[in-house]
């Protein structure tokens, strides 16, 4: 086999696997230029590379919320750096995962990971492959899907930078209202949808703090209760969606905005890239010193 034939096989292997030039060259050399065996070699080598990176922390990446027909999904795909989250391979993977999730049913992350995409790889296999080809740990972290009933509408919002996404499910037919509240959720990050969801322990703790207020001192019991109620409502507006002033029309609460538009809040969900992941603190001076000693 001459050099041009070898170069042609390397080119073909790169097109098939999307692997780097040196990896394809090595795969063909290791398999005596058998294309099928070289593909298998790259797959196994990719799994080994991914396994080596499995202990790394992937806290960057992108989130996305999307709607197709009567289905909606929200998911997070992580990388180790924001730079990688902007490259074409990562963005293509986001597109493929989004399409696969919205087209298929899943009840858990395990079932979501095993959904097949258009390239005949499962989501888990695709992220493993991406880890090998990109060179960073790529992690499909979480996902949720809604399949809507006839009287339901859902609003989806993904911030332009891809770091925040939200879904808001309502009983009603007004898609614009649902999307507007989804945008509100992304911006204001409420902890609870309604006051009924706030743990009683948290309510009692707030009341105990408010009772220390000088504004209550010397007031009759009835007036104290009125002031206390006002303080509590103001506090709830900080972290309860329906109590919050609506960002597009602050004279209305979100609850009032929904009622005015014949919509009833059913469920909300908001993802932010990396939330809850403990990032490793890097001491660059120590790291450089350690490298110099090697």
From Swiss-Prot:
It is found in: Cytoplasm. SUPFAM superfamilies: Elongation factor Ts (EF-Ts), dimerisation domain, UBA-like. Residues 81-84 are annotated as: Involved in Mg(2+) ion dislocation from EF-Tu. InterPro entries: EF-Ts_dimer_sf (IPR036402), Transl_elong_EFTs/EF1B (IPR001816), Transl_elong_EFTs/EF1B_dimer (IPR014039), Transl_elong_Ts_CS (IPR018101), UBA-like_sf (IPR009060). Keywords: Cytoplasm, Elongation factor, Protein biosynthesis. One of its GO terms (molecular function) is translation elongation factor activity. This is Elongation factor Ts. It comes from Mycoplasmopsis pulmonis (strain UAB CTIP) (Mycoplasma pulmonis). The gene is tsf.
